[in-house]
Amino acid sequence: MLIGYVRVSTNDQNTDLQRNALNCAGCELIFEDKISGTKSERPGLKKLLRTLSAGDTLVVWKLDRLGRSMRHLVVLVEELRERGINFRSLTDSIDTSTPMGRFFFHVMGALAEMERELIVERTKAGLETARAQGRIGGRRPKLTPEQWAQAGRLIAAGTPRQKVAIIYDVGVSTLYKRFPAGDK
């Protein structure tokens, strides 16, 4: 059975173009979402995935209607393949029921993995460069060294940690980490 999926990013957008293309392709059922593709909560897609069974073909108008990213799309199509479900994208001329379509998706999977590895590589290189220039990653410290010293003096003088935490707007656990209980 051919089962279609349409998605638009906002409620005021229209799915007619996608629906017409899927109807012309012979889809018997069409599921719909009116939500951004970056959102992981897509009720129409979830319902569609529960409905699909071995031998079915999931049909979309265009690849970007289904996946949030290339990596997400490749993972999703691989999960479908494991369940015996084919995938077809009308405008991209992809059909995983054919050897060429399956090959194309293997290539896409390799490209998605390479993209992920390149991002990791660039991130590491950027962090190394920043460290070499004396910059430290992460957020700025909540307190200056002088404020930490003052907080330590207050605790040493017997001020309850809860009160010091309120004064410096830090958690009590943060104070215990910085000034363990036995270190008064």
UniProtKB/Swiss-Prot annotation:
SMART domains: Resolvase. Pfam families: HTH_7, Resolvase. Its EC number is 3.1.22.-, 6.5.1.-. Residues 161-180 bind DNA. Residues 1-134 form the Resolvase/invertase-type recombinase catalytic domain. Coiled coil: none annotated. One of its GO terms (molecular function) is hydrolase activity. It comes from the Bacteria. GO terms for biological process: DNA integration; DNA recombination. PROSITE patterns: RECOMBINASES_1, RECOMBINASES_2, RECOMBINASES_3. Keywords: DNA integration, DNA invertase, DNA recombination, DNA-binding, Hydrolase, Ligase. The active site is at S9 (o-(5'-phospho-dna)-serine intermediate). InterPro entries: Homeodomain-like_sf, Recombinase_CS, Resolv_N, Resolvase-like_N_sf, Resolvase_HTH_dom, SSR_resolvase. PANTHER family: DNA-INVERTASE FROM LAMBDOID PROPHAGE (PTHR30461), SERINE RECOMBINASE PINE-RELATED (PTHR30461:SF2). Belongs to the site-specific recombinase resolvase family. This protein catalyzes the inversion of an 1800-bp E.coli DNA fragment, the P region, which can exist in either orientation. The function of the inversion is not yet clear. This is Serine recombinase PinE. It comes from Escherichia coli (strain K12).
